[in-house]
């Protein structure tokens, strides 16, 4: 009986491993960038739930070109490109405002560096720049290096990113979907959602709407309820759920009302 149970357990384990093989998960707080990464021979090809193995995955890839979707900022369209993995990663990081991203390897040591800012090409270590860089780099590396049909699961990818970078990150996520990759994100960012909606409305081919699904989770007396947010190519979000990213609009309206009231009082 024990032997039969072991055989069944082994088969179940193989099935689970097969199912989960194409899934990659990055948690809500990625690891802070290190000044140097030391290869101790324990890297098993996975980026890690905190992106802690980004440097090793980055250097593991060969120079053989990969196909990926880039974004043309002038025409504001996605275009298919082919480039070595590290070049593709650098291109998308540049689009996100992380310029001159590069890495050096010295025996078992790895170091990431990038331009100090948009006005200088002076290189600085990745640990000497804003925390947001460490949050987005693992997402770009894993997203570009996984294959079509595989799935990337992200929790709060917007953490420590300013609004513009959040919107650019939404474009990157869309580029993965356009290339046949799947992305599941849990987000509180209206900037990411609004960028998705904008791209759907701008899309003349009608292909983006079928690639994007938005669900809103809310509490109720009976537990959590999942509402599907319907998107239209002509009207954007059709059925705004109650309290679905309406706080900013309400706050802006109250600011405008306060300004109007103050001006009216000053005229008295």
Question: Model-found features: residue ranges?
Answer:
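Phosphate-coordinating catalytic segments in nucleotide- and nucleic-acid-processing enzymes
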Residues: 1-136, 147, 230-268
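Extended, amphipathic alpha-helical scaffolds
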Residues: 129, 138-141, 168
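Hydrophobic core positions within the conserved protein kinase catalytic domain
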Residues: 140-143, 173
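A short, proline-enriched helix->beta-strand linker immediately N-terminal to the Walker B motif
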Residues: 143-150
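Walker B catalytic motif
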Residues: 154-157
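ABC ATPase nucleotide-binding domain "signature" loop
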Residues: 159-161
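C-terminal lobe/lid and adjacent interdomain/linker elements of RecA-like ASCE P-loop ATPase modules
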Residues: 168-268
């Amino acid at each position: 009986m024990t032997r039969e149970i072991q055989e069944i357990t082994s088969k179940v384990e193989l099935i689970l491993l097969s199912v989960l093989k194409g899934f990659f998960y990055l948690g809500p707080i990625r690891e802070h960038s290190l000044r140097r990464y030391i290869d101790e021979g324990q890297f098993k090809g996975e980026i890690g739930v905190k992106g802690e193995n980004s440097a090793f995955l980055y250097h593991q890839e060969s120079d053989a070109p990969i196909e990926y979707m880039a974004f043309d900022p002038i025409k504001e369209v996605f275009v298919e490109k082919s480039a070595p993995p590290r070049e593709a990663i650098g291109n998308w990081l540049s689009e996100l405002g992380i310029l001159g991203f590069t890495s050096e390897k010295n025996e078992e040591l790895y170091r990431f560096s990038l331009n100090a800012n948009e006005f200088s090409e002076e290189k600085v270590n990745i640990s000497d720049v804003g925390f947001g860089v460490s949050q987005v780099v693992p997402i770009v590396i894993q997203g570009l290096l996984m294959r079509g049909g595989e799935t990337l699961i992200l929790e709060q990818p917007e953490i420590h990113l300013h609004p513009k970078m959040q919107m650019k990150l939404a474009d990157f996520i869309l580029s993965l979907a356009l290339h046949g990759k799947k992305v599941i994100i849990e987000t509180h960012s209206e900037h990411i959602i609004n960028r998705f909606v904008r791209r759907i409305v701008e899309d003349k081919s009608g292909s983006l709407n079928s690639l994007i699904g938005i669900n809103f989770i809310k509490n109720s007396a009976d537990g959590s309820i999942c509402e599907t947010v319907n998107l239209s190519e002509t009207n954007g979000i059709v059925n705004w759920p109650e309290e679905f990213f309406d706080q900013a609009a309400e706050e802006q309206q109250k600011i405008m009302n306060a300004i109007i009231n103050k001006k009216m009082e000053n005229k008295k």
